[in-house]
Amino acid sequence: MGCCGCGGCGGRCSGGCGGGCGGGCGGGCGGGCGGCGGGCGSYTTCRYYRVGCCSSCCPCCRGCCGGCCSTPVICCCRRTCRSCGCGCGKSCCQQKCCCQKQCCC
């Protein structure tokens, strides 16, 4: 089950998303999430320790990654372009991240 795309699950997402998930995950987003370290400052990175944790389990990175990722990634929510490590090896720009096949810079 997990918390893929449910939006309202803070912290570790243990126990599911409790209501209002609408449509479910649509794909194998199993398991929970690791801890989402740190606050949400300009230079914060949130690390996802399991598959399917983009945009719902880490509040400060919500909206940075679109949908589920196929592998655990480091999603950078930064205002400047830096190395991203989200799979395509380019960069993150304007608080958006390249967790899909193409970067959104």
Swiss-Prot record:
Keywords: Keratin, Repeat. Residues 4-41 are annotated as: 10 X 2 AA repeats of CG. GO terms for cellular component: intermediate filament. Belongs to the KRTAP type 28 family. In the hair cortex, hair keratin intermediate filaments are embedded in an interfilamentous matrix, consisting of hair keratin-associated proteins (KRTAP), which are essential for the formation of a rigid and resistant hair shaft through their extensive disulfide bond cross-linking with abundant cysteine residues of hair keratins. The matrix proteins include the high-sulfur and high-glycine-tyrosine keratins. Human have a similar number of genes as other primates despite the relative hairlessness of humans. This is Small cysteine and glycine repeat-containing protein 10. It comes from Homo sapiens.
